[in-house]
């Protein structure tokens, strides 16, 4: 399944049980809730999914469960990137062996801090040798390096690099959209830019806020498409402070607390991320109005 009709992707949390183990049952409940409430595609095993603290066996089980529970309703993207090129290829191909995965999200290599030449070499090799379409993940706040727009434009010419999740601002999203092939998927990774990204011609948003406000976001995009820009803007203005609140503590602790609050139990976080205490939860819930 392709992503052409998927404008709102949820970067899904990984549900744990009360003992902190991965929970297949809670994953099923969460996926059904998300798909009933505005989500048009899923990203699993990403930053919000606490991928760095999942074992490979847990990741693969999460992916298999996600394919099963999605049951062909929406496209599925899986985080497979690392700062080791060969390891990224090997793991991406292991994920590709699971029928029902539609693309791999590959983060710009972190910690090693490659230059633009190194980034191009990394992504070309990953794209050449991977059995899944590749989507670049450009998030300098977490990687320590920024993939420049010219580099993105160059990589967008590769047949197996089909899109980007970009977290560098609307100016760069505008430049990317203007200069890449028409079928290249440009997603913002910043909830506050969800409307701007779409107005600028991007595909949409890979969102955390859609865990809680997916229906609102879908209404926002529908309003935009029907020409009701005023309503779309109103929804976005209401969403921005709530999206900010969902990052008021290290992610995904706020969104997990919010999901637990509204009745979709996803457990807590794994160290080094700590779950919110009661005072922090109460402060968050006031901001979220839940």
Curated annotation (Swiss-Prot):
One of its GO terms (cellular component) is cytosol. GO terms for molecular function: 4-hydroxy-tetrahydrodipicolinate synthase activity. PROSITE patterns: DHDPS_1 (PS00665), DHDPS_2 (PS00666). Pyruvate binds at residues 48, 206. HAMAP family: DapA. Belongs to the DapA family. Homotetramer; dimer of dimers. This is 4-hydroxy-tetrahydrodipicolinate synthase. It comes from Ligilactobacillus salivarius (strain UCC118).
